[in-house]
Amino acid sequence: MSKTEVRKGETIEDTLRRFKRTVSKDGTLVEARKREYYIKPGVDRRMKAKAAKTKKKKR
């Protein structure tokens, strides 16, 4: 859980920018999107293999 306190003399925009930076750095949103719904292990393996194949093809 990210926690950001407003510093003295800091605007709300600056605080929000710092909060967004800490959330993206922690990977909170990525983790939430990943856990949005359950993916069976077999399906997960197939998706990862397909992504790796596509990535290799681009190189």
UniProtKB/Swiss-Prot annotation:
Keyword Nucleus: no
UniProt KW keywords: Ribonucleoprotein, Ribosomal protein
TM region(s), chain numbering: none
GO CC annotation: ribonucleoprotein complex; ribosome
Molecular function per GO: structural constituent of ribosome
Keyword Ribosomal protein attributed: yes
Domain of life of the source: Bacteria
One record GO biological process: translation
Annotated InterPro entries: Ribosomal_bS21 (IPR001911), Ribosomal_bS21_sf (IPR038380)
NCBIfam families: S21p (TIGR00030)
Family: Belongs to the bacterial ribosomal protein bS21 family.
Protein name: Small ribosomal subunit protein bS21
Source organism: Acholeplasma laidlawii (strain PG-8A)
Organism lineage string: Bacteria, Bacillati, Mycoplasmatota, Mollicutes, Acholeplasmatales
